[in-house]
Amino acid sequence: MTFSLLEAYNRLKETNAALAARLLEEAEWGVEFILKNRYGDGYRASSMGLLIWQDGVLNTLDDIHSVRVQNLAFDNFLYAGYETYAAMTIDRDPMLQEHLRKVAEEDFSFATEKFKKDGFDQFKQMYEHSYNTSHSQYMATISWSASMLYKLTGKSCYAETAAEAIRYVLDCQRTEPLKDKGRTCGFFYRDKSRKSIVHYIHQSREQVYMQAMTLLCETQKEHPDYQKWSNSLKLYGNYLKGLMKYTQPYGMVPSGVYHAEEYKDSAGFYSLHLFPPANAQELYTEQITRGVKLDKEHYLKRFPVWFSIFNGNTAIHLSTGKSAAICGNFLKDEELLNIGREQLYWTVGKNPFGQSLIYGEGYNYPQMNTFSSGEMTGEMPVGIRTLGNDDIPYWPQPGTKLCGA
């Protein structure tokens, strides 16, 4: 959230000073929170479970003691990138800027040492959004974070790390067309084994692949691998363009391509599908076959495959929409930029239900199931979902809607 606020601030600071100032103020609270939960030795408070609205007073009955503290290389790579971006953005506090630069380099160093020692993290907290992190997403995150630090410091070691990490990601991208009429390609697999394709449920980090590629192209234009990075962007952009015909006349970007037997990658399958039913593999097959068959092994799904309470499509299509916008800006491709815009249009009412999904914005926005905070202007739901094993939108009436997020 802090990173998004800072991105919005940079976008608006020249055109809407008042709104930009509020965005920066909120972002600075976020930066303070990030720094307070960093212990300076690789460990940090990573998350907590909370289902009540607390009184804000220490040592009372509603205190929560379930804070999860971990030393994960992935977390430190990710936060190093965020801290770096904050250091490049918050220019009204030189002392904070210098501190952010210092901790960003420290956190990246902690992450690098742990990654060299232990390899990919073993994610154990299933309620954290990192639990489903694939190896390709992991390496894209390393590359993006390293490029951020290179942009800030100019140190060649970060440029080298960024270029090296992305090679793994490129090896995970599908470049050979499927055997469908559209010759679909450009999507990413979870790892080099290519047993399963990158998917998300309930939350998404899809945009990190394109963030990493574009930042490499921006910061290392003379690198021998520049054309590989640029071509990766074009492949992925064409992949997104090819998806859009499956949701016409609406502009919601589909979930993407699925292999018929992704459940055989048991580690990836069960890190994605939390609390799956005993017949999850059979349900997987049922759900993908209700999508669009592309060839003997692949199907196109408009909505993700999902089995449990962890569903809702808002984060998924908005993240992919951000990927489209990133590609569109780099490639100067208006069709991709429009795909990004369509995800916003869907969110504010250009959907089959004619409802804005943002409380207080647009028309016909629904009541949310916000059981602890009450209704708040600007709140968004987890999103439109499907009914049973179908692959069409389902949006139940107020009182049974997904929890506001």
Question: Which ranges hold each PLM region?
Answer:
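Aromatic (Trp/Tyr) and acidic
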Residues: 8, 52-89, 129-164, 192-242, ...
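Solenoidal tandem-repeat scaffolds enriched in leucines and small polar residues
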Residues: 77-96, 103-109
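Short helix/loop segment immediately N-terminal to the Walker
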Residues: 15-18, 93-97, 117-131
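Acidic, Ser/Thr-rich low-complexity linear motifs
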Residues: 121-133, 176-191, 196, 360
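Active-site-proximal loop/short-helix segments
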Residues: 49-56, 114-126, 137
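N-terminal catalytic cores of secreted or lumenal carbohydrate-active enzymes
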Residues: 2-71, 82, 90, 95
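Long, well-ordered core segments of solenoidal/helical folds
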Residues: 26-43, 101-120, 160-184, 231-253, ...
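Conserved helix-loop functional segments at active or binding sites
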Residues: 10, 85-92, 113-120, 148, ...
